[in-house]
Every structure is written in structure tokens, then in C-alpha cells.
């Protein structure tokens, strides 16, 4: 008896929502033909908190604690972009010392983000040990953050015109010690991981993105630089004082998951180079432009009234955002983090549009995983490096 040939049944499975400690609450609906991926649909929004709408009825200083919840592994960058936008809108000068402190904090935050990408990425592809190794450097980093800002993660350290506090006594020496120790740590990771045959089998020629394709998808950060495009906003936009340091843009031309790993590992070394130069050359002077904090009381005769001071809710003294629109961007660890700000001659922004790198980089995932094996999904997803706090906002 002959059995009639039937169309092979496809299997639809749910991957996720993943645990928040790994890639955040991302859900993937995957269509499989055996082990081969036919289709993949990411489901977003589980961590949506209305961050853009919240910004519209907060002053910039009131809004600063919220922004650290976007990319909660690299909070200095979300703070930097939040204060950079009104600074550029109001043409506010930042003292040289404050600019150096900002660069130091940003590069420390970049190293912390890449470390906490490396651990879960290796765990995704089956290597559990590096997940525990990266916590050594991470703990030292968070000790430095805690000494300077008072907080280990949600720092709330940047201010319009500078930073909240100067570096404490002895902090620079401790940070230089960390740089020396961290360099040996990066060399150790490269010895353990980069030439490991099992690791190479999992990542080489997996999730390849060409240079033109990366530009067409609007990718940024290590995703773009791993595809042969030498584009780094620290070199392109010349913000803060990055031009005063000697460092190179790290890039690879292969465009696969291995190339993205190599770019991030190399970026950690470059960040340490920038840190060492900034720490050794940091100038004296004020850490904040205090002129910004002056409040024009002549306009507001009610400012000293009893009702205003003791009864009604009063915002922190802040300046008006001019009736202009502006796009500001920084090179975050995951790519281009941007803010489109529209002022309305008010202390509140009229529109605060966030351009998160993770959200845009994630869009290419369904195309990358098609015709790959099921096990390759976690490799490719891990190599993209997403944090759902900034994806869902």
C-alpha cells in the first residue's frame, strides 16, 4: 500500500519571554521545519513604561532618574544624552574638568556593558564559566561607580552643565589600578575564548550581515562596525573631549557573530586606553557650570510666596527649553543612542523622542535567523546585544 505524500507539518514554538537577567523579556515566535528556522517573529512591549510620555511633564532634572531605566547596564549614556540635548539647545558650556569626568564615566560604563554582554553571550552558546569570570571586573567597576556617584547602577550623576559631584580623593589612583588589572583580564578572555574551537564552531559564519545591508537596516555600533563600516560617533561628532585622546575605531569586515564579538572585545581595550589618558591628563577647575543653576526670579513673583514654597508642588529650578527642535546622539555600547527634542518655551519638553540602538538593531533578527538551525537563534540574538528596557521604553 502506498502512502500519499503530504506536506511536511511545520512546528511553531515560543522562545521566551526570556529571563530579565539575560536578554530581557523578549518573546520569539519561531516556525520550524525540523531543526531549520522558517520564520521568526519578535514580540515586543513587555517592558513598555511610557518613557517618552513621562518626559513631557517632567523637567530635565526630574526626568534624569527615569532615563537610567532604559539601558540599565550602561546608565551613564542615557544620562549623557538627556543632559546633552538641553545643553545644545541652550548653548550651555561645560567646564573642561566636567567633560573629562564625563568621558571617564562613559568609558567605564562602556566596559561594564561589554562585560555584561560577554558573560550571558557565552552562556547562551554553552560556556558557563566566563559568566562568573566577568563579575570580578564588574564588581571593581561598580565599586568605582559607588565611590564617585553613591550608586552602583542607577547613578543619576550627570547634570546640565557638568556632573553632580567631583571625584573623591584617591579615586583616580584606584581607577588607574583598575585599568591595569582590567587589561590583563581582557587578555585572559581572549586566550580562553577567541581561539576555542568549540566557540569558533558556534559563531563563525553565523548571522552574516554585509556592509551595505547593515546601512540599509540602519544598524549602528558594533553591529555596523563588524560589517566593515568604520563609523563611530565619538570620531564623527567630536562630542565631549574625545578628540584630545589617541585611540582607534575598532572594526571587522566579516560581518558574522565572531566579528561582533571581536569588535566588542577590542573596544574594551580601546576604552581602557582612553581612560588612562583621561585620568592622567584631567585638568583642575569646576565640575559644573553653576550659571545654569541660577533661577530668574524676576519673571516669577510667586516664587517666594508661602503657598508656592510650602503647599503647592514646585519643580526644581530649571531653565526654559527654547522653541526649537534638535537631534542629539552619542555612541552608546550598543550603537547610536539619540534624542529628538522639541522645546516649546517651557520647562517641559514638548516632544521627547528616543532613538534606542537596541530596538533598531533587533529588527534584522528575523532575516538573520531564517534558514539557520534552531540553536543558532541564541547565538545571533546574543551577538546583537539587546536590553529590553531601551527596546520597549
UniProtKB/Swiss-Prot annotation:
Gene Ontology terms, MF aspect: NAD binding; oxidoreductase activity, acting on NAD(P)H, quinone or similar compound as acceptor; quinone binding
Subcellular locations according to the entry: Plastid, Chloroplast thylakoid membrane
Keyword Transcription assigned: no
Keywords for this protein: Chloroplast, Membrane, NAD, NADP, Plastid, Plastoquinone, Quinone, Thylakoid, Translocase, Transport
Listed GO biological process terms: photosynthesis, light reaction
Enzyme Commission designation: 7.1.1.-
Pfam families (alphabetical): Complex1_49kDa
Disulfide bond annotation, renumbered to this chain: none
Assembly with partners or alone: NDH is composed of at least 16 different subunits, 5 of which are encoded in the nucleus.
Protein task: NDH shuttles electrons from NAD(P)H:plastoquinone, via FMN and iron-sulfur (Fe-S) centers, to quinones in the photosynthetic chain and possibly in a chloroplast respiratory chain. The immediate electron acceptor for the enzyme in this species is believed to be plastoquinone. Couples the redox reaction to proton translocation, and thus conserves the redox energy in a proton gradient.
Protein name: NAD(P)H-quinone oxidoreductase subunit H, chloroplastic
Source species taxonomy: Eukaryota, Viridiplantae, Streptophyta, Embryophyta, Tracheophyta
Amino acid at each position: 500500500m502506498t502512502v500519499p505524500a503530504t506536506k511536511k507539518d511545520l512546528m511553531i514554538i515560543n522562545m521566551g519571554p526570556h529571563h530579565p537577567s539575560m536578554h530581557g523579556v523578549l518573546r520569539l515566535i519561531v516556525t520550524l521545519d525540523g531543526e531549520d528556522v522558517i520564520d521568526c517573529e519578535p514580540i515586543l512591549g513587555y517592558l513598555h513604561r511610557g518613557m517618552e510620555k513621562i518626559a513631557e511633564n517632567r523637567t530635565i532634572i526630574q526626568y534624569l532618574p527615569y532615563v537610567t531605566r532604559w539601558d540599565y547596564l550602561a546608565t551613564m549614556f542615557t544620562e549623557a544624552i538627556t543632559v546633552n540635548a538641553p545643553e545644545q539647545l541652550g548653548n550651555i558650556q561645560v567646564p573642561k574638568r566636567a567633560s573629562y569626568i564625563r568621558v571617564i564615566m562613559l568609558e567605564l560604563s562602556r566596559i561594564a556593558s561589554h562585560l555584561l554582554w560577554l558573560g550571558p553571550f557565552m552562556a547562551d552558546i554553552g560556556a558557563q564559566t566566563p559568566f562568573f569570570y566577568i563579575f570580578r571586573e564588574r564588581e571593581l567597576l561598580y565599586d568605582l561607580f559607588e565611590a564617585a556617584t553613591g550608586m552602583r547602577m542607577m547613578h543619576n550623576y550627570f547634570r546640565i552643565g557638568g556632573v553632580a559631584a567631583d571625584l573623591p580623593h584617591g579615586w583616580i589612583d584606584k581607577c588607574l589600578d583598575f585599568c591595569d588589572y582590567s587589561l590583563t583580564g581582557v587578555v585572559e578572555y581572549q586566550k580562553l575564548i577567541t581561539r576555542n574551537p568549540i566557540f569558533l564552531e558556534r559563531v563563525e559564519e553565523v548571522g552574516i550581515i554585509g556592509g551595505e545591508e547593515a546601512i540599509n537596516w540602519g544598524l549602528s555600533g558594533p553591529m555596523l562596525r563588524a560589517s566593515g563600516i568604520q563609523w563611530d560617533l565619538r570620531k564623527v561628532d567630536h562630542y565631549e573631549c574625545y578628540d584630545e585622546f589617541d585611540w582607534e575605531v575598532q572594526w571587522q569586515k566579516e560581518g558574522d557573530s565572531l566579528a561582533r564579538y571581536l569588535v566588542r572585545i577590542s573596544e574594551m581595550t580601546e576604552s581602557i586606553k582612553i581612560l588612562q589618558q583621561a585620568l592622567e591628563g584631567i585638568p583642575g577647575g569646576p565640575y559644573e557650570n553653576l550659571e545654569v543653576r541660577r533661577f530668574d526670579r524676576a519673571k516669577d513673583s510667586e516664587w517666594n510666596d508661602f503657598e508656592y514654597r510650602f503647599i503647592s508642588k514646585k519643580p526644581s529650578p530649571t531653565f526654559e527649553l527654547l522653541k526649537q527642535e534638535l537631534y542629539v546622539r552619542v555612541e552608546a555600547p550598543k550603537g547610536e543612542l539619540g534624542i529628538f527634542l522639541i522645546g516649546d518655551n517651557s520647562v517641559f519638553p514638548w516632544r521627547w523622542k528616543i532613538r534606542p540602538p537596541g530596538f533598531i538593531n533587533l529588527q534584522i533578527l528575523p532575516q538573520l535567523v531564517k534558514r539557520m538551525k534552531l540553536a543558532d537563534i541564541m547565538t545571533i540574538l546574543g551577538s546583537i546585544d539587546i536590553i529590553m528596557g531601551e527596546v520597549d521604553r
